[in-house]
Amino acid sequence: MTLPSDVREYPNAIAQALSQLRLVGVNGPYSVLLGADAYTALAETSDNGYPVLEHVQRLVKDQIIWAPAIAGAFVLTTRGGDFDLHIGQDVSIGYTSHTDATVRLYLQETFTFLYLTAEAAVALASPAKPKPKKT
């Protein structure tokens, strides 16, 4: 499935994804993860004066999550048992930079996200961007 290019159609696409989950027996509650562009567009768009975000909130009734690391969106169940997060036992600290007043360090840790049930999420790809016209 693909996110529509018109943000006002997001509720229809998300409703179709929810139907797809229900048809394969995946119960809710459900959440929607949106990439940065999709989330910003959803938060800023209204349909005849009513925020499109509120249309989506009525459909999902759980979290709508800003997920800048993804492109497009995912509609997934949060019922439990479908995903697993394994956090590594290694933590490292590193040096980034310094000034005369501060030192910038970072922490790094490994983790693995396991997708246990293939039907527990529906991906909505980003809409195709229009290609520039050749002159």
What kind of feature is each model-predicted range?
Residues M1-Q57:
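Extended, solvent-exposed, turn-rich assembly/linker loops in the middle of proteins
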Residues T45-T135:
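Sequence/fold signature of self-assembling virion shell proteins
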